[in-house]
Every structure is written in C-alpha cells, then in structure tokens.
Design a protein with these regions (language model features):
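Donor-nucleotide binding loops and adjacent catalytic segments primarily
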Residues: 1-53, 87-91, 95, 102-111
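Short histidine/acidic/glycine/proline-rich micro-motifs that form metal-
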Residues: 15, 78-82, 135
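A ubiquitous structural signal for well-ordered alpha-helices
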Residues: 23, 115, 129-132, 148
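Two-component system phosphotransfer/interaction surface
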Residues: 108-121, 150
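Hydrophobic alpha-helical packing elements
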Residues: 108-112, 129, 141-145
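A short, well-ordered alpha-helix in the C-terminal region of glycosyltransferases
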Residues: 125-139
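C-terminal alpha-helical cap of glycosyltransferases
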Residues: 138-156
Length: 156
C-alpha cells in the first residue's frame, strides 16, 4: 500500500501462475487494478520504458535492457547460477548508482517494500539512477561485432 498509486506488473513464468492463485486464496487478495499478473510478457521493451522502477533478477540480457532504456532497478540476483555471476552483474549497476541490490538470502517482503517505497518517494534520485543506467549502455555493439568479424575474415 502506497500513498501514490502504483501498478505492479508481475511476470510469473509457467509455474508462478498457480502460486498467485494460491496466494489469492491464502492471503485474501486478488489481482486487480494495482496488480497485474502475467505468465509471460511479450512487449517487455515497451513496459520497461514505461516503468519508473524495475524489480528483477540480474541476468546479463535483462541488465542490458535496463541500461538501454535507462531505468533504475532493485536487483535480486539469483544465487542458483554459475559462479554467482548475477551477483557480480548486479553489483556493477549498484556501484554505478543505477540499482539497489538485495541478495536473496537477505530478502524479506518487508525489506523489499521498504526499499521500493523509499526509492519511489525520491523521483529525482530515481531519474538520476536511470541516467546512470543509461550511461552504461553499449549502443554500438552491432558495429563492434561486425568490425571484429571483418577483421577475422580479412586476416590471412
């Protein structure tokens, strides 16, 4: 519950849909105007661009999308990945002032709500974090890859 209206869009994946149905029964809430639950999101770039704040895992492609659209984030790296790479990905954004990282072992509902509420209460800081995220984006990656491939082809 927030003083300002918040729309929470939650992508569950295949197995999370039932979890939300179970929570609805257990906790007495239902998705409505402020909570939209989807199994899969087809228009992620559009929704990321419209978001004020993104709560997400910290896979490399997800972070590249956040950087491309310049969005502040709360990142919860998955501990169940090779060499804990999501943690290191997330920490780079936090060091750059583009994200707040909460490790899963430290995550509680209360901590997440407090973190999100504090961030949403500071629109100027959110905007700054978004600019910091955008500054990390590599916009010429296609050109870089093409140049590298051309050098390989031209090398005898």
């Amino acid at each position: 519950k927030n003083a300002k209206p918040v729309l929470h869009l939650h992508a569950t994946g295949q197995y999370g849909v039932q979890l939300f149905k179970d929570l609805e029964k257990e906790k007495g809430f239902a998705p409505g105007d402020s909570l939209v639950v989807k199994e899969y999101i087809n228009n992620m770039p559009e929704l990321l661009a419209a978001a004020d704040l993104v709560i997400s895992r910290a896979g490399a492609l997800t972070l590249a999308e956040l950087e491309a659209v310049g969005r502040a984030a709360v990142l919860i790296p998955s501990p169940n990945v090779a060499e804990n790479h999501q943690y290191y990905n997330a920490m780079e954004l936090q060091k750059a002032g583009a994200a707040v990282v909460i490790e899963e072992k430290d995550l509680t509902g209360e901590k997440l709500v407090q973190t999100v509420s504090e961030m949403l209460a500071q629109p100027g800081k959110l905007a700054e974090m978004g600019k910091n995220a955008r500054s990390l984006s590599v916009d010429d990656s296609l050109d870089r890859i093409a140049d590298a491939l051309l050098k390989l082809v031209k090398t005898p």
